[in-house]
Regions:
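Short small-residue beta-strand/loop micro-motif enriched in glycine and branched aliphatics
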Residues: 78, 143, 213-217
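Active-site nucleotide/adenylate-binding loops and adjacent lid/helix of ATP-dependent enzymes
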Residues: 1-2, 14, 30, 44-45, ...
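Residue-level detector of flexible, active-site-proximal loop/helix-junction positions
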Residues: 37-39, 58, 83, 111-114, ...
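Phosphate-binding site of ATP-dependent enzymes
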Residues: 150-218
Length: 218
């Protein structure tokens, strides 16, 4: 399953095509399914042995697709419905981290409905948030919509832009440091990679565009 309707569609298609090449080399028979072209309900008719989920972002990683996979009663790869919902929803993730005493940056949630700019400075002070700050959509992947704000004017500008497409935003203290990724399969770490982007941070372009020239250190 690849493509879909999210802002990460292009990356999902690339992911899916790479997986198809690899799986065909291993002798598997592959049928592709793109939710942008067919209804998820059509999956049940496929009679597939397993669904390989190569979707990215909204409807692909937030529990939506997973609920249809469960409905189809066909085994599928990657996380289930609840874990996908919590992982894609940054606020839910942060609450789980806090409940389990896992460190996470201080934050403040703002909603498009009823938001008042004049109250923001006081709220940031109350939440002990200091510049530079990070603002991002609550439900988005691949660093889409993530902005680092150095001052209040910059923050207000980005809030206005992001509210055009998103209802809920999260403002956090910026935490600098190393960017390290660790893949885990069946509770086993497969190795770590340090990422050194040439850009300000590991944003969408740094992740996916060769021109960004991000260094990957094994």
């Amino acid at each position: 399953v690849l493509g879909g309707n999210s802002k990460e569609r292009e990356i999902s298609v690339k992911t899916g095509k790479a997986c198809i090449v690899a799986m065909k080399k291993l002798g598997y028979i592959i049928n592709t399914f793109d939710p942008k072209k067919k209804s998820f309900f059509e999956i049940k008719k496929s009679k597939a042995d397993i669904i390989f989920n190569a979707l990215h972002g909204e409807e692909g990683e937030d529990g939506y697709a997973q609920s249809f996979f469960e409905y189809s009663k066909i085994p599928y790869t990657h996380s289930g419905v609840l874990s996908s919902m919590n992982a894609m929803n940054k606020l839910s993730s942060k609450k789980i981290f806090i409940e389990n005493k896992i460190k996470t940056p201080l934050y403040y949630v703002i909603e498009k409905k009823g938001f008042v700019h004049s109250n923001l400075k006081k709220k940031l002070d109350t939440k002990k948030l200091k510049f530079p700050l990070v603002i991002k959509p609550n439900n988005e992947g691949s660093s889409i919509g993530v902005k680092i704000c150095k001052n209040f004017i910059n923050l207000k500008k980005n809030i206005k832009v992001l509210f055009k497409n998103y209802e809920t935003l999260i403002i956090e203290n910026f935490i600098g440091g190393q960017e390290i990724q660790v893949a885990v399969l069946d509770n086993k770490a497969l190795g770590a990679i340090e990422l050194k982007p040439k850009r300000k941070f590991y944003d969408y372009k740094a992740k996916y565009q060769k021109s960004a020239k991000t260094d990957h250190i094994m």
